[in-house]
Amino acid sequence: MRLGFLSVLFGDRPLKDVLKLIKPLGLQAIELGCGNYPPDVHCKVNELLESKPKRDELKAMIKGEGMIISALSCHGNCLHPDEAFAKKNQQVQTNTVLLAEQLGVKVVCDFSGCPGADDESTKPNWVTCAWPPDYLEILEWQWEKKVIPYWTNQAKFAKDHGVNIA
């Protein structure tokens, strides 16, 4: 087992400096933030997707410090009831999976997401209780209409690209 860290904790520093800071601690792996809630300061997904030399440079920098990329992180809310917000998060997730494939990284970390209570919602609704029955109806709608269909498709997409979503 390797011990690692999430790069966004050091978002105020260049990646090269972060790696030099972390190396003496004995950590061997890095999870790179790729956008959505975690900033993409160390891993500009679109730039890396477009440039093999930039991907090679990133991998060499990390390998040069004796580390591996354990995962790419794009925690977001792809199920958000605000369609524009959800689509932006979905695009970051899709591109992160594609980048993981190109980098040879097998894991992309994400949030499951939280839809609204119904199609008219404008804010996510996290159901935390089973009573009164209205809440169970919301939960059933969320799972059957939003969560299961979305993640069934995304799991297949990730699998088709040799990536697991965690």
Predicted feature residues:
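Conserved beta-strand positions in the central sheet of alpha/beta enzyme cores
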Residues: E31, A71-S73, C109, A166
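Extreme N-terminal starter segment of soluble prokaryotic enzymes
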Residues: M1-G4
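Structural motif corresponding to alpha-helix initiation and N-cap regions
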Residues: D12-K16, S51-D56, E83, T94
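Active-site beta-loop-alpha junctions enriched in small/polar residues
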Residues: L6-F10, G33-Y37, C74-N77, G113-P115, ...
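Active-site acidic/histidine proton-transfer and metal-coordination neighborhood
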Residues: D17, M61-G64, C78-A166
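Catalytic domains of carbohydrate-active enzymes, especially glycoside hydrolases
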Residues: K16-P38, A100-V107
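Radical SAM/AdoMet-radical enzyme domain recognition
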Residues: Q28, K59-G64, I68
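Glycine-rich, proline-tolerant flexible connector loops at the mouths of alpha/beta enzymes
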Residues: G33-K59, S112-D119
